[in-house]
Amino acid sequence: MKQETVKSSEQLLSVLGTYIDSPVDPFRKERVMFSRGSGAYLFDYDGGNYIDLMNGKGSIILGHNDPSVNAALRNFLEQDREVVTGPSKPIIDLAERIKKDSALPDAKVSFYTTGTAACRAAVYAARDYSGKKIVLSSGYHGWDPMWRQQGPLLEPNEDGVIEFYFIPELLERALTAHKDQVALVIFSPDYTYLSASTMERILGICRAHGVLVCCDDVKQGYRHRQGSSLELVTTEKADMYVFSKGLSNGHRISCVVSSDEIMAETKEHTYTAYYQMLPILSSLETLKKMESGKGYDLIRSYGQTLTGNLKELFVQSSLPIEVNGSSIFQLVFGDEELEEAFYREAFIQGLILFEGDNQSLSLCMDKDVQVDLIRRFANVTDVLSEQFKHLRGKEVTTEQTFRTAWNMIDGASDLLPYEKQLKLLDNLIGGG
């Protein structure tokens, strides 16, 4: 990293109070700052180029600075149509589109700026509607302190939230222990480590106990299909949905969708920038492009091709590295030193990866980009194959995969039976 980038990073650290969640240059230990992005590529202030698999942690679904989205935004602004004082027609267009995609009867939509805010709003609405306090949760719902787990397993935190970690048996225990006290069960679906049968069991248990269910589709919604990803694996529907990352190609927007009765509890959820239209327009253009260009099918095929090539590459290297998933995928390592070296070398080769978490593809990752991707990954394995030749032939264990999956889904996976899951939970969270 050259002097200009280092200087910019130091300036950023001196003025921002929040954690800077961007890749680190392994030599200077400085955060990378980007000057621009185009399609699958990012560029730093010194001209270095990278292929981005972090993709704004999954919110860049078309590619950076998509020409269609940028043109729509420019045209809107040049016509002086941005009015924050009150609503404009595009907000109706987007709400009607999301309502239609949800297929919920009498649905209404409320908009927010982040997935964190929308998940919190869903909890508030469910509590106000039901008159109950307890919330049962699985998965990541944002940085809000309400989701922190501070006590023993299946004990509510100070905000009344209990984690069940995608384990149906724990969900059943929690619902039985807190009968008639549960306002909502909220979970973030996963399609890499959780089976369709597990998610159907979770929904079935909720229905048997008569509790409201919210599908936190911030990450998965509008990524695999129009609307909720849950319908990929079950005909069961949730009572509430939260969408965000798949909507707008990186612009700040999220929403809660539910029935008219439940959404009436969100009527006071307004804020200064509620009627800002640029995120709305970006969403409309993104959804139109994904649908008209068969974007969901293309990204799915890109994911299958890329992960297939990566699996072959790692087999050839004989190193303990696995690839799990497809258009959203995770790398799993059989050795901690190898993992650290892999991410370090990946950055050197111009790959932006979400370390320890999920990598995500965008619509612009066509054949040419994938050839470049595999070339860069091959450079990584070429370097590491010699450096870690003592690991050749070693395999990734099921427990290693379970622990790595935990970092991605914030919960237990189907890789181990219930009894073994509980033993690992005791180690991972201090359960009981």
Curated annotation (Swiss-Prot):
Span of the signal peptide: none
Family: Belongs to the class-III pyridoxal-phosphate-dependent aminotransferase family.
Listed GO biological process terms: antibiotic biosynthetic process
Modification type N6-(pyridoxal phosphate)lysine: residues: 245
Role, per record: 6'-oxoglucosaminyl:L-glutamate aminotransferase that catalyzes pyridoxal-5'-phosphate-mediated transamination for the conversion of paromamine to neamine in the biosynthetic pathway of butirosin.
Keyword set, alphabetical order: Aminotransferase, Antibiotic biosynthesis, Pyridoxal phosphate, Transferase
Pathway: Antibiotic biosynthesis; butirosin biosynthesis
Name of the gene encoding the protein in the UniProt record: btrB
Cofactors required: pyridoxal 5'-phosphate
Pfam families for this protein: Aminotran_3
Recorded catalytic activity of this chain's protein: neamine + 2-oxoglutarate = 6'-oxoparomamine + L-glutamate
EC number: 2.6.1.93
This protein's name: Neamine transaminase BtrB
Xref: InterPro entries: Aminotrans_3, Aminotrans_3_PPA_site, PyrdxlP-dep_Trfase, PyrdxlP-dep_Trfase_major, PyrdxlP-dep_Trfase_small
Source species, domain of life: Bacteria
Gene Ontology MF terms in the entry: pyridoxal phosphate binding; transaminase activity
Organism of provenance: Niallia circulans (Bacillus circulans)
Keyword Chloroplast listed: no
